Amino acid sequence: RMEKTMQGGFEIYQTVYEKSVSMDAAETLDVSPVLTDTLIVRGSRRIGYLVYNEFLSEPAGASDGRYDEQLKAVFADFKRQHINELVLDLRYNGGGYVNTCRLLCSMIAPQSALGQVFCIERFNDDLHALYGETVLRFLPEGEVGGCNLNLARLYVLTGPWTASSSELVINNLRPYMPVKVVGTTTEGKNVGS
């Protein structure tokens, strides 16, 4: 409909739309954090490449661990392909759950790291009385589905959106193996959830 208003002696006509629209709810997408994985062969080097975008074990509202299982399947495939190097692309990974991070690291680390200290969860003074501290260890081979790659080193691609559990990967594997970081400075949010 048209409305007439007066401003400064001029007539101004405005078109006003008063139509409401109903739309059905959009379908929920299940987007796996494993964006892509591939094998690159260069002479004797068999390089696994993985773009991993979030440390989630399953989609919101689910309790089936399907994303962790997909991650294990990728590493089982890497193991079948006998990769001897890994490029882990975390440029767009803002973090996620520490347990999923621990799973990923347990599949990357040298076998000698399995069962060793992965991280120690310490809480602030207010919560320390309630929770104390928890020592988390790299998972044993049986808990990673036989998918430990026993790698000698890791290459991690980083960017300004690399944060939290992504930084935990870098910092917590370094005591056990060389981790080569390629890219820009990470966000600097080295905390877990």
Enumerate the language-model features and the residues they cover.
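Flexible, low-complexity junctional segments that flank or bridge functional domains
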Residues: 1-86, 94, 100, 110
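Extracytoplasmic/secreted envelope proteins and their assembly/folding machinery
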Residues: 68-75, 89, 101-105, 154, ...
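Mature extracellular/periplasmic domains of secretome proteins
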Residues: 73-79, 141-145, 171-174
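Sec-exported extracytoplasmic/periplasmic mature domains
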Residues: 76-80, 106-113, 162, 174-178
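Gly/Ser/Thr-rich loop/hinge elements
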Residues: 95-153
